[in-house]
Amino acid sequence: MPSPRREDGDALRCGDRSAAVTEIRAALTALGMLDHQEEDLTTGRNVALELFDAQLDQAVRAFQQHRGLLVDGIVGEATYRALKEASYRLGARTLYHQFGAPLYGDDVATLQARLQDLGFYTGLVDGHFGLQTHNALMSYQREYGLAADGICGPETLRSLYFLSSRVSGGSPHAIREEELVRSSGPKLSGKRIIIDPGRGGVDHGLIAQGPAGPISEADLLWDLASRLEGRMAAIGMETHLSRPTNRSPSDAERAATANAVGADLMISLRCETQTSLAANGVASFHFGNSHGSVSTIGRNLADFIQREVVARTGLRDCRVHGRTWDLLRLTRMPTVQVDIGYITNPHDRGMLVSTQTRDAIAEGILAAVKRLYLLGKNDRPTGTFTFAELLAHELSVERAGRLGGS
């Protein structure tokens, strides 16, 4: 199947006409998301394959929804990449680990799923052939008497097809994530957290009018991150920011920073924008893809954060969603992105420029992290866990630990 190509930086949308549109149409047709349209059989007219028409727009939106992408009908970098990844089927190419330029695709995801069913792979089924996939493949090859070279070629494929039809299992990654949370205990002190404020550097985002004067979207998110960082540090957590004030790294760079720190959790803060001024509310996102792979702890934390922020601020509940954005799929720890409101909406904007609202959001996120590690024990109703109670609980856990060790 052909994979779409375009000039870097270009994005295609309804009404555009180019050769790249023909390739997008072919890619979606091969995936079964668009009918063959060389000729309209009802009228006998040829369809303009280079035209990005309304029917193609609907197919692109359906594809984006299925793949956990932003559903806007625009074929930009992320959607192009997803179309290319979706074009690969296991066996169509040789799979191996490429340092600096890892392979991505649905064929890699299928390989990961089969190795996971056989008990060799415990990571997320994310379609990324990294070191964890390489090591799992080599372990499988050694176990089954194959050349342990980490290359998924014809012989390894035949073996996998034979065994995969006989073995299926649960999600070792979910079990591993849950065990890490359980074994780390309910105490927040010592937990390592990456806080990721959006925008930064020359990317100021939109400017809002606050009580003390104009405030940019970047400054608003930085202020919220600082409030959250201060509360976490006061409770004994080890906190790191994903960027300085003068930089706006890409999502991949932010994920790399979190991985280098070896964080337990990553919490990303964003404002949402929309051309419609009516769009409003808060939403939280975790890793989840069309292969059925989900970050269980990421989903649990996103759910806690969503409920806490809604309860404390009264912002509209736009719910929790699984997505495949780089920030969520490239991090090696549970990661949640919180869109704290629509800065383009007058009501949300008026709330977000208020320091009281940002305090409430910061305390809600901290309470959500605490509830994640409590695992249901000594929990509080949503929206009622105060900062003073969190401090008191940390002291009681520390005191109990000292008494138990004496």
Swiss-Prot record:
<dbReference type="InterPro" id="IPR036366">
    <property type="entry name" value="PGBDSf"/>
</dbReference>
<dbReference type="GO" id="GO:0071555">
    <property type="term" value="P:cell wall organization"/>
</dbReference>
<dbReference type="InterPro" id="IPR002508">
    <property type="entry name" value="MurNAc-LAA_cat"/>
</dbReference>
<keyword id="KW-0677">Repeat</keyword>
<dbReference type="InterPro" id="IPR036365">
    <property type="entry name" value="PGBD-like_sf"/>
</dbReference>
<comment type="pathway">
    <text>Cell wall degradation; peptidoglycan degradation.</text>
</comment>
<feature type="region of interest" description="Peptidoglycan-binding domain 2">
    <location>
        <begin position="105"/>
        <end position="160"/>
    </location>
</feature>
<keyword id="KW-0378">Hydrolase</keyword>
<feature type="domain" description="MurNAc-LAA">
    <location>
        <begin position="193"/>
        <end position="370"/>
    </location>
</feature>
<dbReference type="GO" id="GO:0016998">
    <property type="term" value="P:cell wall macromolecule catabolic process"/>
</dbReference>
<feature type="region of interest" description="Peptidoglycan-binding domain 1">
    <location>
        <begin position="18"/>
        <end position="83"/>
    </location>
</feature>
<protein>
    <recommendedName>
        <fullName>N-acetylmuramoyl-L-alanine amidase CwlM</fullName>
        <ecNumber>3.5.1.28</ecNumber>
    </recommendedName>
</protein>
<comment type="function">
    <text>Cell-wall hydrolase that hydrolyzes the amide bond between N-acetylmuramic acid and L-alanine in cell-wall glycopeptides. Is able to lyse whole mycobacteria, release peptidoglycan from the cell wall of M.luteus and M.smegmatis, and cleave N-acetylmuramoyl-L-alanyl-D-isoglutamine, releasing free N-acetylmuramic acid and dipeptide.</text>
</comment>
<dbReference type="InterPro" id="IPR002477">
    <property type="entry name" value="Peptidoglycan-bd-like"/>
</dbReference>
<dbReference type="GO" id="GO:0009253">
    <property type="term" value="P:peptidoglycan catabolic process"/>
</dbReference>
<keyword id="KW-0574">Periplasm</keyword>
<keyword id="KW-0961">Cell wall biogenesis/degradation</keyword>
<dbReference type="GO" id="GO:0008745">
    <property type="term" value="F:N-acetylmuramoyl-L-alanine amidase activity"/>
</dbReference>
<dbReference type="GO" id="GO:0042597">
    <property type="term" value="C:periplasmic space"/>
</dbReference>
<comment type="similarity">
    <text>Belongs to the N-acetylmuramoyl-L-alanine amidase 3 family.</text>
</comment>
<dbReference type="Pfam" id="PF01520">
    <property type="entry name" value="Amidase_3"/>
</dbReference>
<dbReference type="InterPro" id="IPR051922">
    <property type="entry name" value="Bact_Sporulation_Assoc"/>
</dbReference>
<dbReference type="Pfam" id="PF01471">
    <property type="entry name" value="PG_binding_1"/>
</dbReference>
